[in-house]
Swiss-Prot record:
The modification Phosphoserine is found at residues 4, 54. Disulfide bonds: none annotated. GO terms for cellular component: azurophil granule membrane; cytosol; early endosome membrane; late endosome membrane; lysosomal membrane; lysosome; mucin granule; perinuclear region of cytoplasm. PROSITE patterns: SYNAPTOBREVIN, V_SNARE. Residues 1-74 are cytoplasmic. Gene3D superfamilies: 1.20.5.110. InterPro entries: Synaptobrevin-like (IPR001388), Synaptobrevin/VAMP (IPR016444), V_SNARE_CC (IPR042855). It is found in: Lysosome membrane; Late endosome membrane; Early endosome membrane; Cell membrane. It comes from the Eukaryota. This is Vesicle-associated membrane protein 8. Belongs to the synaptobrevin family. One of its GO terms (molecular function) is chloride channel inhibitor activity. Pfam families: Synaptobrevin (PF00957).
Length: 100
């Protein structure tokens, strides 16, 4: 009788060890899931920050592009006016409207 009772104790001990092992594995899995959730939250926050930064960069770059476009337009107009004045003087000298 004691031999069979001793085997039962081993079986119960083995089952408890297995249950403890499964419990440890489940605890690790829950910790990993929580860490993953925290990592996802951190990643989402970084993504939102990056999105806001990219919007700011987009508007700033558009303003800079517009500023340089106007600067180029002003330079082209200035060059055209200078060329027109030079051509006007050449024509006026050639026609004799301005005495030499």
């Amino acid at each position: 009788m004691e031999a069979s009772g001793g085997g039962g104790d081993d079986r119960v001990r083995n089952l408890r060890d297995e249950v403890e092992g499964v419990k440890n594995i489940m605890t690790q899995n829950v910790e990993r899931i929580l860490a993953r959730g925290e990592n996802l939250d951190h990643l989402r926050n970084k993504t939102e920050d990056l999105e806001a930064t990219s919007e700011h960069f987009k508007t700033t770059s558009q303003k800079v592009a517009r500023k340089f476009w106007w600067k180029n337009v002003k330079m082209i107009v200035l060059i055209c006016v200078i060329v027109f004045i030079i051509i006007l003087f050449i024509v006026l000298f050639a026609t004799g409207a301005i005495p030499t």
